[in-house]
Amino acid sequence: MGYHKKDCTPNRKKRYAQGDHEYGCYPDDHYDIHKEKKISRTVADFSYFNQAGSVVLTSTSTDPSVEEIIGLVKFKEVFNGDLISLGGSSTVTVGNISPKAITFRIHKVTTPQYNPLLSPTIYVHTVSVNANMTFSVPLEFVDVFIDDEAEVNYYYTVSIPTGVEATATVSSSTHTGNLYR
């Protein structure tokens, strides 16, 4: 009758330590199973800010592009492999002098900056518009992390292009975010 060697493969390395004897591994008494990353995804907490009221975009034919922040979703402690699902919608009312298009963006900020609009853009959605129209714009995006971050902020913005004389009002904006770990 022989002994069966216990499995010490890398995925079990934390739970078991290599023994000094020929029979394999023994349980590691200092290992906390509750700290082990779970395979199933769960929703984590997040902080949410939505711009109060409405945003009015107004430009002249000599102005550069006008971009305004309409929402912010913030997460603390994001880890490798985490999945973030962002969503939301905004109602847009275009004035009688309209831009040809309105662009919605999501900017991702992992380190605090003075101007979040200078951070990388991870989502762009452009909508063609006509004068005196009202419509709703849905926003959906999924982000997967490959590095750990102490904090990540997602800024939702809306803009009209350069060199256009236009007015538009963005209201009833709702933005949500779910982090799955």
Residue ranges: model-predicted function:
Residues 2-181:
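Extracellular jelly-roll beta-sandwich "head" domains, especially the C-terminal globular C1q domain
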